[in-house]
Structure formats: C-alpha cells, structure tokens
Amino acid sequence: MPMEILEERGHLLTEQTNPQSQNLDQLSSLELVDLFNQQDQLTVTAIAGAREDLAAAIEIISDALAKGGRLFYIGAGTSGRLGVLDAVECPPTFCTPSELVQGILAGGASALLRSSEGLEDIAADGAQAIADHRITQLDVVVGITAGGTTPYVHGALDAARARGTKTIFIACVPESQAPCQADVNIRLLTGPEILAGSTRLKAGTVTKMALNILSTGAMVKLGKVYGNRMVDVAVTNRKLEDRAIRILRDLTDLNREEAAELLVASGQRVKLALLMHWSGLSAESAQAQLDRHGGNLRQAMDAAP
C-alpha cells in the first residue's frame, strides 16, 4: 500500500519562517524581549486592517443575540481555547446566561488542560458539535483557525451553513491561501511567527484581540454598558461588589455608604440601582421599565416618567 502523501502547508503565512528571527537561538534575554515586542506591534496593524470585517461581525452577532440567538466560538488547540476563554468571561462581565456565548473546543473540556491536537483533523467531529449544540438559523458560529485550514472548524462551519446559520471565519492567513465561504471573513495578517509555525504567539494574541472586540462590541450594542461602565456586572465576589459600588458613586451623587445601600435595595443589580436612583421608581417598576426597553439603561431612562 503506497504511503499517504501529506498536504504541503509551507505556503501558509503562519507556517513561513520570519526573517527577523533567524538568529533566535543566539539572542540574549533582553534581545528576545525586544524582538517579541517589535513583532507584537504587528497585531495592532492586523486589527486595523480587518476593521470593516470586525464591524460587520459585531452587527451580525448583536442582531442575532437581540433576536434570541446564541454566539458560538469553535476551534481546536490554541484557537479553540481562546474562544472558550472569551465565552466564559461574558457572564461575570455582562451578566449573560452561560448559554448565550459558548466556546466549543475540539476534544472538549479535557483539551483545555492537555493538548489534543490530533482531533483538529476530523471534519465530522466539527459537524457533530454543531448538531450536539442544536445550533439553528437564529445563532451565529465563529470558526477560529490561525492557519485557516483546520478540518474540524471547516466541518463545523459547513454544517452550520447547511442549517441557515450565520457564520464568521477568523484566520491569520490571506483568503487566497485558505478560502472559506463565511458571511464574514476576518483575516488577521500578523505574518510569520518568531518561532516558525508557533501560532500561539502573534496569531494567538491577535485572535484574542479580535474576540475581545467582537464580544464586547456586541454587548455594547445590546445595552450591556452605560458610557464605558459595565453596569450589568454580576456581583459575585468582594472585588466586583466594590466595583459596583464605585460605579454607583461615580454615576450618582451618593457617598460610598449610600451607594452600598442602593446596591442592596436593587438586589445587587447595578443597572437597576441606577434607574431607581435617577427616576425615583421602585425596584419593581424600574425593572419593568428596563424590560420594556430590552435592558437598555439609557433608553429606559429617556422614557422614564
């Protein structure tokens, strides 16, 4: 039986060698730090180059969430772990239910702690993940793959599209090297890595930057913030309780003790506390007002009696 010939991947931007780091093994510690710092500047440039696609993705995600859909990140290895990381931060930051933003990682929870890179080669597993999560046309699926070719991710996106689901593709190679028929193609071109092929470096950094923008941007559109304050923060520990009190103090004329009392009266809900204070409404009436305006504090306040 003839030996299977592996597909050549050397043409991919993320697999190429970086001419700036050819003497990597000869650098001093300070020179290493300087080189990393220099190369990491390219992540900012890459985000700027994808600004219109990132904005389009925010619109798709926020529209879907506003209509009762969910956001799913799906990936393998570092890319998948970054999706999980961004997803699990949404409930404490924006008080969202855990099912609203979810990260799907090839290999499941165990792959968070132990590398399971071989699982990324199975496209059928990606498709099965879409079925297992009962993804529908109301949802949005964001496929993340630094090199742009991961079968697990493409299998998931193909299955999602077949269900009428909106799809977004994030890769760190040009579309000509790894095409994908997604609704939005986000290409974060940071160039070859300092350590050739190690996409946990610049590619990982720029991917996390992009996910920060997508999730936070969508939550801003959904009214989860007021100004630049996280008024939907879930008060689940002393640090977050202190933050909630400081938000109330900064946005009202209350002292710290009064702000703490208001927070208690609102059931530890900053957004509700602010509307109660500004409008004079009871907690029940203020909550009803927020509900009428989809939880948007600014709109609820503008319409308050």
Curated annotation (Swiss-Prot):
The protein's annotated pathway: Amino-sugar metabolism; N-acetylmuramate degradation
EC number: 4.2.1.126
GO biological process, one term: peptidoglycan turnover
GO molecular function, one term: ether hydrolase activity
SUPFAM superfamilies: SIS domain (SSF53697)
Keywords: Carbohydrate metabolism, Lyase
Protein's UniProt keywords contain Cell wall biogenesis/degradation: no
Pfam family of the protein (one): GKRP-like_C
SIS domain location: 61-224
Lyase found in the keyword field: yes
Similarity annotation: Belongs to the GCKR-like family. MurNAc-6-P etherase subfamily.
Protein name in UniProt: N-acetylmuramic acid 6-phosphate etherase
Organism per entry: Synechocystis sp. (strain ATCC 27184 / PCC 6803 / Kazusa)
